[in-house]
């Protein structure tokens, strides 16, 4: 990829683009917002959705997290009344920076990326541990000239640590992607995206009672926030939406 192609790839796209989404959808409540936003944006053509691994209190391990995310993707698609190609991702994190974890998601990205070129790349929106994307790059490094990666991960460069959930789960994968030469747009969490939040009054005003999907998003978010902040005037960061929003940020209308 020459410098002109790289600069163009790092700029917000100016028209309709093809997108794949890599998501740990069951991890918490924000991936569902991001998936819904992507599917409902006419300028973004969703070509595939990949289930990403995660491990926290909502899963018994990375593979369980990936499988639960796979199921959650279909749940959201059903509420949307939409269909999409959905692929299971890595059952484990990278063992090192040289060994891919082969999965249907990584194989699809390797195959699909070949249909694109530097002047018309495939946009890869990643909102979880970036294992699937790193694995695809390790399996076929030539795809780095054909994709643009927008990742929600890490913290702002002036933040006091880098112990961010998506990054710390698979540091090797983050190193692979960042060092691969693929055009890479980072949406840092604390210090940047942490400003993007919603509240119970906003959720109830804009979503409650509108449709089954809106009710699901509203209920999920309120229940999650009330589990630790009941009785207070809370707000909840909906991190993952920003990675999709970057693709729609023409003329700096959002950021």
Positions of PLM-derived features:
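N-terminal acidic, glycine/proline-rich low-complexity segments
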Residues: 1-255
């Amino acid at each position: 990829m020459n410098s002109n192609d790289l600069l163009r790839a790092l700029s917000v796209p100016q028209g309709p683009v093809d997108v794949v989404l890599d998501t740990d959808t069951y991890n918490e409540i924000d991936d569902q917002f991001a998936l819904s936003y992507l599917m409902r944006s006419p300028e973004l053509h969703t070509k595939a959705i990949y289930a990403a691994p995660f491990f926290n209190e909502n899963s018994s391990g990375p593979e369980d997290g990936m499988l639960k995310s796979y199921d959650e993707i279909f749940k959201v698609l059903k509420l949307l009344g939409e269909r999409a190609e959905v692929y299971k991702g890595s059952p484990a994190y990278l063992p090192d920076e040289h060994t891919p974890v082969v999965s249907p998601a990584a194989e699809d990205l390797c195959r699909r990326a070949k249909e694109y070129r530097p002047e018309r790349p495939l946009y890869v929106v990643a909102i979880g541990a970036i294992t699937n994307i790193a694995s695809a790059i390790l399996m076929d490094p030539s795809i780095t000239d054909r994709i643009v990666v927008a990742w929600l991960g890490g913290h702002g460069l002036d933040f006091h640590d880098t112990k961010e959930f998506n990054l710390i789960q698979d540091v090797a994968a983050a190193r692979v992607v960042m060092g691969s030469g693929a055009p890479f747009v980072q949406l840092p969490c604390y210090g940047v995206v942490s400003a993007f939040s919603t509240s119970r009054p906003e959720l109830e005003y804009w979503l409650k009672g509108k449709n089954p999907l809106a009710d699901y998003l509203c209920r999920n978010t309120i229940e999650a926030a009330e589990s630790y902040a009941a009785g207070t005037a809370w707000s909840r960061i909906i991190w993952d939406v920003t990675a999709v929003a970057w693709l729609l940020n023409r003329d700096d209308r959002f950021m």
